[in-house]
Amino acid sequence: MALPNQQTVDYPSFKLVIVGDGGTGKTTFVKRHLTGEFEKKYEPTIGVEVHPLDFFTNCGKIRFYCWDTAGQEKFGGLRDGYYIHGQCAIIMFDVTARLTYKNVPTWHRDLCRVCENIPIVLCGNKVDVKNRQVKAKQVTFHRKKNLQYYEISAKSNYNFEKPFLYLARKLAGDGNLHFVESPALAPPEVHIDLAAQALHEEELQQAANQPLPDDDDEAFE
């Protein structure tokens, strides 16, 4: 869903809402996609910036109109107008700030109150930073709510496309859909230790086979 003053397209397009605490890297993440950054539009009445992000798939071009809060979440809850007609969502937290993960259930509740039964991806951002506070095995919320989870690093472009590919497959109802061309991304601002991150990803896989804790707080003990 584009803004009233924004160009529409004749290929499939979807409203993607991105939520999470302030400072988790939502805007940085969206701005990696250079053509979307060039064509963004701001809507002051809702306090939102909408970035049109195009991806090229084996089934043709698709567009996500990424609704970014432009920092409004720092002043309390978001208005329902931000969520209405949302067709998919990303909930983002910062793996270096434990509170941002503890607030994920609140964001999920607010989102699902307005947007029922939409595909949602949970993203743990800033995995390039050394002093990680939320370990991979401590991330369990997605398993409780049947969400997809990815570890990402917006500033290094690590796993940038994965949330979009997952959502595209869900929205198209085609598990074989794939991207045939990479979007133009801003050059990495930082470099990620891929060997260390591979260990986190392995920890995540092992945790998926463990029983869920009764309470998320238990995971941090």
UniProtKB/Swiss-Prot annotation:
Asked if the Swiss-Prot or TrEMBL record annotates the protein with the keyword Protein transport, the reply is yes
Q: Which UniProt keywords apply?
A: GTP-binding, Nucleotide-binding, Nucleus, Protein transport, Transport
Could you give one GO CC term from the UniProt record?
Answer: nucleus
Note the superkingdom of the native organism.
Eukaryota
Tell me, in one coarse class, where this protein mainly resides. nucleus
InterPro entries referenced in this protein's UniProt entry, alphabetically:
P-loop_NTPase, Ran_GTPase, Small_GTP-bd, Small_GTPase
Small GTPase Ran-type domain location is: 10-174
The record, for Pfam families, names:
Ras
Ranges for region Switch-I: 40-48
A molecular function annotated in GO for this UniProt entry is: GTP binding
Is Ubl conjugation one of the keywords? no
Q: Which GO terms describe its biological process?
A: protein import into nucleus; ribosomal subunit export from nucleus
**Annotated region described as Switch-II, given as residue ranges:** 71-87
Q: What is its quaternary makeup?
A: Found in a nuclear export complex with RanGTP, exportin and pre-miRNA.
| The protein's role, per its UniProt record | GTP-binding protein involved in nucleocytoplasmic transport. Required for the import of protein into the nucleus and also for RNA export. Involved in chromatin condensation and control of cell cycle.
Q: Which NCBIfam families match?
A: small_GTP
**What PANTHER family has UniProt attached to this entry?**
GTP-BINDING NUCLEAR PROTEIN RAN1, RAN GTPASE
Q: Which family does it belong to?
A: Belongs to the small GTPase superfamily. Ran family.
Q: What is this protein called?
A: GTP-binding nuclear protein Ran1
Please tell me the species this chain comes from.
Answer: Solanum lycopersicum (Tomato)
Its lineage opens with: Eukaryota, Viridiplantae, Streptophyta, Embryophyta, Tracheophyta
